[in-house]
Amino acid sequence: MEIVRNGIKCCLAWPPNYVLIFGEFYHFKCRRSVITYDWSNLVGADEFLCAVGYAHPNYREPDPDFDPFVMYCSSNKMLALDTVTDELYIIAESPAHFCSIGLRNFPPFARIELDIELDRLWYGETKCSGEEFVLLQKNIPALKNFVNRQCGQKIRIDAFQNFDLSFCSSNDIHYITGSGILEKILRRKYVVIGTCARCQVEPNCRAVILLGPNFHIYVYCDNKINKVARSIREFIRRGFEELLYKERYALNWHDDSLIYVSESEAENLNRMLNGESPILRKKPRHMYPRCDRYVKIKVLLFGILYTILLLMVPWMFFFRLLKNMPSILFAVHSSEISNPLVQSVTKFLHPIIIPNGDTELKYIVPVTESRLINGLQASAAGRFGIKGLRLCSDGVIWNRLIDYEYEMFKYPSTFTRADKFLLQLRDLKFMEDFDPKWQCITKLAAVGFYSGASLFNLGAKPGIGYWCRYLCEYLSMLFFKLDGKLKELSKESKQKLGGFSCAFWSESFKTEMQNKTESFFRRDFFDRFQLYLLEHFLLFCGCEECRYNFFRFKNVGTMKKNPGSVKLHFFPALGKIDLPIFPHLSEKYSNLSMFVAKDLCLSFIEGQIEHSRFPISVTVDMGQDKRNLLNILSNIVFLLFIIQTLNSVLFTELKMYYDVYLDELKNLESSMECEMKLGSKGCMNNIVYFNMLKQVKDIVRNPGTSSNFIFNCLEVIKMSFEIPYYKNYDETNFMESFYLHHLYIQRQPAKHTDLVAANNLAPGFFIVNAKEKSFIDVLERSIVNIEAEYLSNTKNINGAMALFFSGLKYFGNFGNGNFQTSPEKDVRAVGYKLGGLDKIQNDLCYFANVETLACVGVDASDGNE
């Protein structure tokens, strides 16, 4: 590559007002040579570099000892030289890529200090110039105080990606993937500064960001600590680009401070965060200062001995017990002591005076306005607008909806299905001051949100409709392969079929196979393929098992033979379903019925796809061409069975939700008419209310069908939320019970899995500002009718899904390797807590609960103080 005309300038895509001037080093009177950098570890042994030119601001000439010099590599990559440090960086994958991004991937630009205007011009919403957070990088005590003050606040990370950093400290985190790992990290002198993630991610799924002992920025992810940037400023501007850059080109940081955690050390937090752990006590274990069980045993033995010695002085022993009891203090900053929201919590506490010189570590729970506002996102009332429920019922509904909002799992069987959800809906408990006639609004909202997310959102992986589309595309690919396998049949195989194959695979039948909408969900279409599979086994094999299966199915029409019928664990309301007949199935598929009952084999199918294998393989001694054809037919029958069973579950659930929707819709109409007749304040003369009633009556007369009722349901929900009583309902009592419970002031018992899960997840919503777009607005943009055209992916096509399976047409094998499944991934990796052991600070006001006031060992002030 040779530069034809030196001195030509062209504008760069980034930074703004930068240009690239072409020329060799010597054209700019620089003594460097491109050949020198051919020995860089970024350049392969058989590669070479060519000069391109200097990048510099347009208002001045290039500075050879300051501005970056751009080079081209023979492997088509673009590189840039930092002329200050003499380091070489890969900045683009190709010249075209370089033209589109400019010098975005040039790390030294992210480290320089810019004035406020230029910083905004270069990096948009990210702020670094003069920011306190950036300036405190090497002042660890001040940085910790800053993080504690800003806990719950977010800042934008990465000017070119949608990341955010939420401030929090090690006192706000209970576990990172497992017990003891956080302590191990802190012992290595790392400092927790927050958690980071893309937007619309649950707080418990965020990655922990750390400041290392060398003042570099690290991230804890996938059971290891990785360096992401050399400074806070660079991390704010570039995010994780440096880490991705190192991994992409297999480069090392040469950093001995990296930590790797073994899988045995990393526990699965999902069991705790999903509510499967033992029931929480009145105070969780992390609120006890003495966490060493051996210390507790020694203290207990000492107490027994002390009891014997002080048997004549019982009051001294009682005082000793009180002094050793764990205490919780609630800290409020002096600037927020008069905040109404903070006062709604502190009115249940007693202010206390801390003696001067008290250096003992105490368990302190910060109470701030931002935390209390954030915390309401951990309730169905605050996040979804579903009002009137008691705390226990609110936690159940919130936990169910939050899983769907964040798409926490990938298989529908992991979520609660309609039968169990409607039982929970029936058992909802409402606040005593909530008018019973408006309970229908709460139930309508719960049914509408849950059914919309679980059934009508065909683009989300947790939905049943998504998997119908997924498997329909897979089945279409199998039909394509079937045509190829028929052409591969040998002359001897065709003679064995005796002309049957020609009659079977007629042009009309091929057209029917290609019509996904009309064929894939029909029972007779499945029965035909089941019969064709058995006929082909009879003609190719002809053993006793094949003859028995064929004539039994042909004459009796039953499929209870081999392997039998099963009942779906996740949806028993469907009853027992008969399994297809697969002659000569491999021995490793003996547990196939167990996987069908567990999750309809979805994890098994996806696991096989990930390893480029087809789900079903048969073991029969015959030619390869015949075995391939039988394998394809077996997989077609298997997928048709799964698709039609999913379809049955889908429409059974639709019917269940639709019946509840109709009942609650009629209840809403009656309640609104009653309110209108009684002439309650704000209704009789309210033309808006009258119009809403008219619209509800119209919807009652035309409620829609079970396959499209969600559209009317969401319209009714939005109108119902505007009804004066519901809109203006005073939630003070609920909010008080919510804060008292989650701040461990007045804990309510949690014996239900959903309540335990809600209790474990809620601290993360207090600490991380998780307020997102309105759930109902997001739902309205993603729902579609439940029709065969949508379920078969022939209407509103998921292009990525179709492209994926079209690429698999020429790949795949049968029966090689072990039986593979794709289990649910453990996406929740951070467990939060609302306080930690800390020292008393002078600028904070402290409060104590009435129950533990005597345990603090300090004086209680009167109300005036």
Swiss-Prot record:
Belongs to the herpesviridae U4 family. This is Protein U5. The gene is U5.
